Amino acid sequence: MRIEPLIQGVVARSAHPYGCHASIKEQIEYVKKAPKIKSGPKRVLIIGASSGFGLAARIALTFGGAEADTIGVSFERGPSEKGVGSAGWYNNIFFKQEATHAGRTAINIVGDAFSDSVRNEVIEAIETYFEGEVDLVIYSLAAGVRPKPHSDTFWRSVIKPIGESVTGASILLENDQWVETTLEPATEEEAEATIKVMGGEDWESWIDTLINTESVAQGCKTIAFSYMGPEVTHPIYLDGTLGRAKIDLHQTSHALNLKLANFDGGAYATVCKALVTKASVFIPALSPYLLALYRVMKEKGTHERCIEQMQRLFTTKLYDQPKVPVDGERLIRIDDLELDPQTQAEVSHLLEQMNTENFKECGDYQGFKDEFMKLNGFNFDDVDYSQDISLETLASLKP
């Protein structure tokens, strides 16, 4: 069968396995040429390792100088009668192939990161492959739901404003349409559920588990990813349910920092730049900002994807420095290039002009959509998309 791109709204319903491999190789090539991580960690656990920042961090730490061995946890779908499976499934497979070829250990654990069974599997893998200890734990889950303990019910996250409704534009990638949407404010219950799913509680629970099983090495660090953004994004992001969850994550980093101080380690929330990811295209009213930001940062030569952000994080912030540089709230900031005042002034100017008629010319819509397609293995020049791929071949690939 031939695998074609299939998009519903802002959700990709297909992924191209060999395109996913091309994406992995492209990111590996970038970090091999970039400034090297000199004093990085050797044994890394990534919770949420199959796409976005988690995957980019895994690639950077393995191929960008640190030569790390990794255990990656993710919840992904393999091939079946229903379809070829998710991009993350193939990212896991081809990352492992490349890492193994380079002489590195790469263990993939596919399952629900909130479950006890997956935690037990991770502890066992740390014992087996890492001599019982990890040097770095990266928490990069982008889940929409979290099971309630000892129950059949779930907490569900929502992307909504708090207090008052917000009107803004979303862009449906399926048909390249600009759609005005109004989001009603979240209820208190919805805001609390979003904190449960996307806040710091599960991150802290993972670190507690690792401490209690004596799986934390001397000097062990942990990071989780956050976003704050400029004022124009605050109504839907920082002042909304997502922002509440991220503030909870920031507070958790301080509690974990105290716990890891016993091991001469540390915990940090890392504030990243706005990017096209599987998660970010879901956020209403963020798309026009991304189009304007991509255009301005590319024109200035400061644009970064996940992989550039992660390589810079490990070489200039988390490692290779006498001390981890943080802001007044003890956050690592790699959103500095995005929030440059001149960049933001130019972005604001574009947003004032942007509308349903001109968004493709006014912003970098082509770059925005291209990046989305590449998340799912499409739009790579060196991949033959006309080739037939059998489900049996795909089923033989194991993460």
Curated annotation (Swiss-Prot):
Gene3D superfamilies: NAD(P)-binding Rossmann-like Domain. It comes from the Bacteria. Involved in the final reduction of the elongation cycle of fatty acid synthesis (FAS II). Catalyzes the reduction of a carbon-carbon double bond in an enoyl moiety that is covalently linked to an acyl carrier protein (ACP). Keywords: Fatty acid biosynthesis, Fatty acid metabolism, Lipid biosynthesis, Lipid metabolism, NAD, Oxidoreductase. This is Enoyl-[acyl-carrier-protein] reductase [NADH] 2. It holds the Pfam family Eno-Rase_NADH_b. One of its GO terms (biological process) is fatty acid biosynthetic process. One of its GO terms (molecular function) is NAD binding. Substrate binds at residue 227. It comes from Vibrio parahaemolyticus serotype O3:K6 (strain RIMD 2210633). NAD(+) binds at residues 48-53, 75-76, 112-113, 141-142, 246, 275-277. Monomer. The gene is fabV2. The record marks 76 as: Plays an important role in discriminating NADH against NADPH. It catalyses: a 2,3-saturated acyl-[ACP] + NAD(+) = a (2E)-enoyl-[ACP] + NADH + H(+).
